[in-house]
């Protein structure tokens, strides 16, 4: 057994604005309204698994489809370690978006578990969306995914992401190559970062989701509690600031979320790292790094709770 992880409380007493109503991301209080009815008075609900290589843009696309931040985005690979469900509404359809860990050739046990989780989500979903970084094209990771994709029986959609930085002729060639290697029910070219083409994909997913009742209230955008999302936001800021210096195993936990009388909230978090040397990196000189991370996280958490 190794030593327990070093820990340092993220700047105690951080405050974020209190939500305007008591609606957490994972719960709903108040009157439940019936969802809008589609043609023939029928609602739809589809579980959509987003799979792809690390940094293909799955988390960015999840946020774009939902219209709000429900999963963190970082340059660092494998920042999505568990299944994240974002919930989007498109007319009479509810789309439960499963943002999965990136699929690659794993070496460590944790990596193998994450890749297994991603493929398990694909087999359990109603529709599978494969994201390809159009700027990278078909590399070894994409080839490995395509080779195994044939085992998935669900409808499959190919999405070429990051089209804002790729020439159109190259996109068309890439789309033809990928469709020759695997069978897809539809192909979309979009930019999750700019939003271009996202609505077309959303509309298709809604139209092809199975008929059935919604699984979540209309106002809910994620199945994660707000305190969990707050921890993930701090982890995102941590990785964005210390991209090279910190392993992705670093974690953040929200220990306290207390709403105060003045309408703010007191949030206390703990950052866990593996070694004392990493603790010093997170702290920075005279605590400058941890203070900057805390300030960035508080700003985003405050904005998110105001729109929740």
Annotate each PLM feature.
Residues 1-42:
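Intrinsic disorder/low-complexity segments
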Residues 155, 164-222:
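Canonical P-loop GTPase G-domain recognition
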Residues 68, 87-91, 121-128, 152, ...:
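Conserved, well-folded catalytic cores of nucleic-acid-processing
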Residues 51, 55, 61, 84, ...:
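Residue-level signature of catalytic and energy-coupling elements of molecular machines
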Residues 226-308:
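P-loop NTP-binding site
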Residues 57, 197, 289:
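Conserved glycine(s) of the Walker
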